[in-house]
């Protein structure tokens, strides 16, 4: 699937919010902080089984997360701190939401695997940056082949979780228990795809 590689298509959905925030002169780091707060509130809403609130809080957390970088580019306020802060906020929200949803809807084992695999799927990129040395940037983002490798990343995780939240709210046969298991399994396969790509392209002794 890899929605990340189709960023220009996704931009149509979040750019209006980003442009509004740009016109309001909202600082990019404040937008990132807002995304973090909304994501944390979403995790708490899942904990208290307020599924509709959790759905919208998680949705807007994702939209603000997409908007912060766009606002930074539009306003010329891109900083390395902002990029790091955005990354930390992403992992905080993902870990908290997947952990709580996994624990209470699928059990502690699935929660552990879902959080661990999600973090590994992301952490493999900065490790690759450090070891392989990707440096080129486009619009503030590091250009690397892994951006297009792995069919199930953060956008797919969010979309799946939001979809199964609605299923759970509607009391359909497939709910959040099944959703978190699907996310975990697909993330594992996507991580394996990234590892195999790195092995194929950088596994030779001459490349070390």
Question: What is the predicted function of each stretch?
Answer:
Residues 1-18, 87-208:
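A feature for the membrane-embedded catalytic helix bundles of lipid/isoprenoid biosynthetic enzymes
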Residues 9, 25-30:
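N-terminal membrane topogenic signal
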Residues 13-23, 48, 72-80, 139-143:
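Short juxtamembrane and helix-loop transition motifs at transmembrane-helix boundaries
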Residues 25, 45-49, 167:
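Helix-loop junctions at the membrane-solvent interface of multi-pass transporters
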Residues 30-81, 108, 113, 172-188:
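Membrane-embedded alpha-helical segments that form the functional core of polytopic membrane enzymes
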Residues 83-85:
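Membrane-interface alpha-helices at helix entry/exit sites of multi-pass transporters
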């Amino acid at each position: 699937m890899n929605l990340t590689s189709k960023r220009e298509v996704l931009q149509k959905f979040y750019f209006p919010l980003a442009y509004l925030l740009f016109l309001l002169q909202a600082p990019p780091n404040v937008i990132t902080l807002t995304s973090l707060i909304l994501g944390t509130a979403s995790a708490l809403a899942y904990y208290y089984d307020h599924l509709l609130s959790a759905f919208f809080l998680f949705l807007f957390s994702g939209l603000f997360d997409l908007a912060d970088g766009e606002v930074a580019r539009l306003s010329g306020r891109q900083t390395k701190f902002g990029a790091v802060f955005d990354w930390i906020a992403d992992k905080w929200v993902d870990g908290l939401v997947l952990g709580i949803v996994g624990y209470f809807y699928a059990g502690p084992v699935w929660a552990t695997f879902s959080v661990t695999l999600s973090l590994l799927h992301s952490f493999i990129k900065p490790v690759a940056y450090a070891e392989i040395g990707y440096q080129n940037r486009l619009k503030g983002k590091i250009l690397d082949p892994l951006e297009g490798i792995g069919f199930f990343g953060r956008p797919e995780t969010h979309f799946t979780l939001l979809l199964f939240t609605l299923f759970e709210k509607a009391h359909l046969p497939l709910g959040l228990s099944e959703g978190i298991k699907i996310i975990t399994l697909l993330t594992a396969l996507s991580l394996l795809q990234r590892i195999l790509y790195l092995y194929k392209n950088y596994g030779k002794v001459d490349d070390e």
